[in-house]
Amino acid sequence: MTTIVCVRKDGKVAIGGDGQATLGNCVEKGTVRKVRRLYKDKVVTGFAGSTADAFILRDLFEKKLELHQGHLVKSAVELAKEWRTERSLRKLEAMMIVANESEFLLVSGSGDVIEPEFDVLAIGSGGNYAKAAALALLRTENNLSAKEIVAEALKIAGDIDIYSNHNHVIEEV
């Protein structure tokens, strides 16, 4: 369980996640890094779900990025197709948000590759809280950057969701 949120504002895309890993009802670690840079630091990914499954998917996505020379949409679609059709991958329990400087997408094991409608995507147990907070901040007149909106949304989600904490990693592309 976790919170991953991605926001686009003023030509910048920021993605962030909390650091909590749980095993059953216990917090096992509070400093897990769920947001990572890939493909020459031009792509950022954030994962929610089983840690081992997320690492498998991240590695597969990185291979797709290399194969398709960093083309985000093509790589995400190819990953979703393989994830959906490859028997050994079908049972992986994770979701991911992938982003570059101009696009970001939600990729799921059910074959979904979704571009956001309102410049916000969020996944994980705290995803709905973070999405609502980010949307509210985007719709309010303020001088907050995409990165600052992500930070505030993660803070709010961490206050509400017991499976998310306040140890955040935020990357901007």
From Swiss-Prot:
Example of a GO cellular component annotation carried by this entry: proteasome core complex
GO BP terms, alphabetized: proteolysis involved in protein catabolic process
UniProt keyword Cytoplasm present: yes
Residues annotated as the enzyme's active site: T2
Source organism superkingdom: Bacteria
Record-level Gene Ontology MF annotations: metal ion binding; threonine-type endopeptidase activity
Record's keyword terms, sorted: Allosteric enzyme, Cytoplasm, Hydrolase, Metal-binding, Protease, Sodium, Threonine protease
Pfam families reported for this sequence: Proteasome (PF00227)
EC number: 3.4.25.2
InterPro entries with a match to the protein in the record: ATP-dep_Prtase_HsIV_su, Ntn_hydrolases_N, Proteasome_sua/b, Proteasome_suB-type
Residues the record lists as binding Na(+): G158, D161, S164
PROSITE patterns, per database record: PROTEASOME_BETA_2
Reactions this protein catalyses: ATP-dependent cleavage of peptide bonds with broad specificity
Cross-referenced SUPFAM superfamilies: N-terminal nucleophile aminohydrolases (Ntn hydrolases)
Compartments, record wording: Cytoplasm
PANTHER family, per the entry: ATP-DEPENDENT PROTEASE SUBUNIT HSLV, METALLOPROTEASE TLDD
Assembly and binders: A double ring-shaped homohexamer of HslV is capped on each side by a ring-shaped HslU homohexamer. The assembly of the HslU/HslV complex is dependent on binding of ATP.
Family: Belongs to the peptidase T1B family. HslV subfamily.
Protein name: ATP-dependent protease subunit HslV
Species the sequence originates in: Glaesserella parasuis serovar 5 (strain SH0165)
